């Protein structure tokens, strides 16, 4: 059987047997088969078959991801992506099997998607969802923020407020986990399960350690609370409506796989409520202008930084006489920058600049040393091969910063992708932490303000609101719950549909986006992590040429961005009318 595909068996065997649905065993010279009905997720574990056997299975041969096919295929030469279905003499059996699979998926509902993403049974997926729902309903009872010594009605309203905040945080996790992990999954560096587990820890940590920086802007930087003096219940209803409206639109977007901006959702909802129920004077226009400008600047910055990072990789790694050694030398530098940035932004031991700088530098150096040793341990045998003069004879010469470089092959390619595979995992962690610190404010800001109004009888802008640690933890838990149950839906759009990603491209996009988001979080700007990441992925695509960016996907994403603010504002106005009627009846 002659196949028009070229597989990189060495690379696939060493890294991808456990992380993706493409491989060819080195010993059997086999082919990778994936279930025909699933272009992104595997329904069953990948089967590794020799060409002499099982040629009549109801499966389709899938061209491997560009990231782990030959380097020439993945880095600039024309790719042949025509999927060739294997001819099966038992066609009726094939149709029957596919119909049964679809029927089972429909029978299990959304749990089938979660089960496929994590490679677990639908029963297990349902059990996980039930545990999360039960925890969401019971944990608020034990939170201090529920209110101590308050009337029963106030406690019940506080309980409902915490649930609204959880709903918003849940949808942030469901939609925005792709900002941190989509490129890693798209390039094959992480599986869905690994991505979600990693994001869960780091999103929660970022929310706890950096959530207060942006939350204050969401509390007091959007609405002029003094306009609602004497109308505390109206403002309270408006804040709840903003959470409900933003959460509703995010859930719709997540269902269809649109990576919309959670920041757009919540800000649009709050502004819509303010304009209708408080007039133009209810909106803090100067602060809103600063926030809105960041929405335009952030994707541009993300695209620019990722473009430069990827061009630097191509210039200083791909075109180096020994790309493997060049990648091994560049990796600790990138790790140093990332670790030092997180240390100074999130965990400063002192506000005195020399001490904080020394701490950041020490953490960065330690991280770089540890990462260098990991690389030497895992890839040392391959790096030793590349030290011989014969290995680098056929490598391309240095030919300019913006040129199209053919790139390394063979052992050199394996080393470069191996190193950048590790680096992309670290950049995904970097992005998860930054995203948790920035986007948890979209749920916690209105939630904390609503609790303050309800329990203290003061408008959000009247006094400084201290954000309790349990409220930050509650928001972090909501994000983790959302990314666990629905996060896989949007990952496909970020990781697959904008441009083809490899570990080097994915690293460039994630590193650029995380840097921009972390810097904005430190300044207290609620920028759109979604805009930043999509811009960064597009920047990598532009670095490869305009034809490398899928215009249809970009148009669909931009269209969903444009309708987010008016939809959020409209829903907030409707929900406010409903909630004011309910509150007038209850109180």
UniProtKB/Swiss-Prot annotation:
It comes from the Eukaryota. Residues 85-98 have a biased composition (Polar residues). It holds the Pfam family PHO4. The chain crosses the membrane at residues 127-147, 154-174, 195-215, 233-253, 265-285, 289-309, 327-347, 352-372, 413-433, 465-485, 523-543, 559-579. Optimum pH is 4. Residues 74-106 are annotated as: Disordered. One of its GO terms (molecular function) is symporter activity. It is a multi-pass membrane protein. Disulfide bonds: none annotated. It is found in: Plastid, Chloroplast inner membrane. Induction: Induction by light is inhibited by abscisic acid (ABA) and cycloheximide. Keywords: Chloroplast, Membrane, Phosphate transport, Plastid, Plastid inner membrane, Symport, Transit peptide, Transmembrane, Transmembrane helix, Transport. GO terms for biological process: phosphate ion transport. Residues 1-71 form a transit peptide. Mostly expressed in young green tissues. Present in both auto- and heterotrophic tissues. Also expressed in root stele. One of its GO terms (cellular component) is chloroplast envelope. Low affinity H(+)/Pi chloroplastic cotransporter. Involved in inorganic phosphate (orthophosphate, Pi) uptake in green parts of plants in Pi-sufficient conditions. Required for Pi retranslocation during Pi deprivation. Belongs to the inorganic phosphate transporter (PiT) (TC 2.A.20.2) family. This is Inorganic phosphate transporter 2-1, chloroplastic. The gene is PHT2-1.
């Amino acid at each position: 059987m002659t196949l028009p595909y070229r597989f990189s068996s060495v690379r696939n065997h060493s890294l991808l047997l456990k992380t993706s649905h493409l491989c060819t065993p080195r010993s059997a010279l086999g082919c990778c088969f994936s279930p025909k009905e699933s272009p992104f997720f595997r329904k069953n574990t990948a089967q590794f078959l020799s060409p002499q056997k099982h040629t009549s299975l109801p499966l389709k041969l899938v061209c491997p991801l560009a990231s782990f096919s030959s380097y020439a295929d993945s880095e600039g030469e024309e790719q042949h992506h025509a999927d060739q279905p294997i001819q099966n003499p038992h066609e009726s059996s094939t149709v029957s099997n596919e119909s049964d699979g679809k029927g089972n998926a429909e029978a299990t509902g959304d749990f089938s998607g979660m089960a496929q993403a994590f490679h677990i049974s639908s029963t297990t997926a349902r059990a996980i969802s039930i545990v999360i729902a039960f925890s969401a309903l019971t944990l608020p009872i034990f939170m201090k923020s529920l209110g101590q010594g308050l009337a029963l009605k106030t406690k019940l309203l506080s309980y409902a407020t915490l649930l609204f905040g959880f709903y918003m945080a849940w949808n942030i996790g469901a939609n925005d986990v792709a900002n941190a992990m989509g490129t890693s999954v798209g390039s094959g560096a992480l599986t869905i399960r690994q991505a979600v587990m990693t994001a869960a820890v780091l999103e929660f940590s970022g929310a706890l350690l950096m959530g207060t920086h942006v939350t204050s802007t969401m509390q007091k930087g959007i609405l002029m609370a003094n306009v609602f003096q004497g109308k505390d219940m109206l403002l309270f209803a408006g804040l709840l409506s903003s959470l409900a409206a933003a959460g509703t639109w995010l859930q719709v977007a997540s269902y269809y796989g649109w990576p919309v901006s959670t920041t757009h959702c919540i800000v649009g909802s709050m502004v819509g409520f303010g304009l209708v129920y408080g007039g133009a004077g209810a909106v803090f226009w100067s602060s809103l202008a600063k926030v809105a400008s960041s929405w335009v600047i952030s994707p541009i910055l993300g695209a620019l930084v990722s473009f430069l990072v990827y061009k630097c990789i191509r210039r200083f790694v791909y075109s180096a006489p020994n790309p493997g050694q060049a990648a091994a030398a560049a990796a600790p530098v990138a790790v140093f920058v990332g670790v030092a940035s997180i240390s100074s932004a999130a965990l400063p031991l002192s506000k005195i600049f020399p001490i904080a700088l020394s701490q950041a530098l020490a953490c960065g150096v330690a991280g770089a040393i540890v990462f260098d040793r990991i690389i030497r341990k895992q890839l040392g045998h391959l790096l030793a091969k590349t030290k011989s003069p014969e290995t680098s004879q056929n490598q391309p010469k240095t030919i300019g910063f913006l040129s199209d470089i053919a790139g390394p092959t063979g052992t050199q390619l394996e080393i470069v992708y191996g190193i950048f595979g590790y680096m992309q995992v670290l950049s995904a962690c970097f992005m998860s932490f930054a995203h948790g610190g920035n986007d948890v404010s979209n749920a916690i800001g209105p939630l904390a303000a609503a609790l303050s109004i309800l329990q203290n009888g003061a408008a959000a802008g009247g006094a400084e609101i201290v954000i309790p640690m349990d409220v930050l933890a509650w928001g972090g838990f909501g994000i983790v719950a959302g990314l666990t149950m629905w996060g896989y839906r949007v990952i496909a759009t970020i990781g697959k549909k904008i441009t083809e990603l490899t570990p080097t491209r994915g690293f460039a996009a994630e590193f650029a986006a995380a840097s921009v988001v972390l810097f904005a979080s430190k300044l207290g700007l609620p920028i759109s992590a979604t805009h930043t990441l999509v811009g960064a992925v597009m920047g990598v695509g532009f670095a490869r040429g305009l034809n490398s960016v899928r215009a249809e996907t970009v148009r669909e994403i931009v269209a969903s961005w444009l309708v987010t603010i008016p939809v959020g504002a409209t829903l907030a106005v409707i929900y406010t009318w409903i909630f004011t009627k309910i509150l007038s009846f209850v109180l």
